[in-house]
Swiss-Prot record:
Protein's recorded name: Acylphosphatase
Family named by the database record: Belongs to the acylphosphatase family.
Disordered: annotated segments: 66-85
EC number assigned by the record: 3.6.1.7
Gene3D superfamilies, per database record: 3.30.70.100
Active site: R18, N36
Keywords: Hydrolase
Residue ranges occupied by any Acylphosphatase-like domain in the UniProt entry: 3-85
InterPro entries cross-referenced by the UniProt entry: Acylphosphatase (IPR020456), Acylphosphatase-like_dom (IPR001792), Acylphosphatase-like_dom_sf (IPR036046)
GO molecular function: acylphosphatase activity
Catalytic activity as recorded in UniProt: an acyl phosphate + H2O = a carboxylate + phosphate + H(+)
Length: 85
């Protein structure tokens, strides 16, 4: 299992972007979360197969859903490695 984190910016809060992202991730067999951030972006963390993560990244970069969203960019973000939980 692999994991990835993305930060999606633009008009992505208050337009059902997280719900649509969740639906897409579940359909791809991924687990994780999509959370609003104070700066107006959405933080997406997902785990699953490499192919499913690639598909989610492509969807995040091209998706026009929900229709009222105006995504300006989706970029991969780095995880901070933890020695212990």
């Amino acid at each position: 299992m692999q994991a990835a984190r993305f930060v999606v910016s633009g008009v992505v809060q208050g337009v059902y972007y997280r719900a649509c992202t969740r639906q897409r991730a579940v359909a791809l067999g991924l687990v994780g979360h999509a959370r609003n951030q104070a700066d107006g972006s959405v933080d997406v963390v997902a785990a699953g197969s490499a192919a499913a993560l690639d598909a989610l990244e492509a969807w995040l970069c091209r998706a026009r859903r929900p229709p009222r969203s105006r995504r300006s960019r989706a970029r991969p973000a780095r995880f901070r490695r933890l020695k212990t939980l």
